Amino acid sequence: MNSSRAVSLSTDDVAGTAKVSARGVIDWFAPVVPDSRVAIFRTICYLFVILDMHLIVRDPISLSRHPELYRPLMLERLFQLPPPSLPLTMALYVILLFGCLVAAANRCPKTAGYLVAASFTWWTAIGISYGKVDHDHLALIVALWVLPTVGSIPGRWDSRVRSAQAGWALKCVQIAVVSTYFLSAVTKIRSGGWSLTSWPESSILMWAVVRRPNGLGQFLMPYPELLHLMQWFAFTAELCSLVVLWLRGRALLLAALFWLSFHVFTVAVLYIHFAPTLICWLAFAPLERFRPWLNGVIADWRQRTGRRAARQTVPIFRDQAVDGSG
């Protein structure tokens, strides 16, 4: 009797522990966050895509004039996408431009969102099918695919609703942001014959500085030991980047500032930016606080402007000026 009761209690404990563990995993992958955070993040992402297609991946239209240089990526081969042509790239450009404007206003979030996601994925694939394959767009493309899953948000920026659906979408973007760094480290290990020391012990940074003698980099060329140390630092930071996914509060803020500084430094040394990834770091931020802060700034400005206008002197014909405040 006692033995069967003990077995029953043990089974209940195991089931309870499993349920708690499953709930913890679900809460981590799909935390309940304000929907307004997604609404604001959507606006930022879609407006950035317009900038991206004009300033970063801006050459698919011109590249489509040279079909002999086209080397399709695995994605394009897998879906048997047609080779780029001038009409095709122009159509993608128009679809992206109007689709982003609609989606940035949080209108037709699923229709416009998926249309932009598919078009920009194809646009970016075309842009990197003629040369070097960059990895700075990973998080942005993931964001474009998961943001439409949240659907319509009543009140948009001013929404007071909280949902796990919004949390899941943002968590996917966060994982993609961190994966950009971690997978970069894995690629370095793989390219070095699966050796942890091959890439950081190489002279790749010196080669990059010699190849791009710009900005701060040209002043670092006489110091190969420092460049060598910087390689180890960057490689170690990329390997440890997964920790960011479990940080909260001030620790998360410090991590975000660290990676922001990291990218500022790469711009200063090599003129290489990671703007699409940096935009997606906003998936970690409490963006729902932006609207109240903006409303407060506008209210303060209006109040100060109103006081100034009230204190201005008002000239009266054939009389001395009087104070408009009373």
Model-derived regions: residue spans:
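Alpha-helical membrane-anchoring segments
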Residues: 2-326
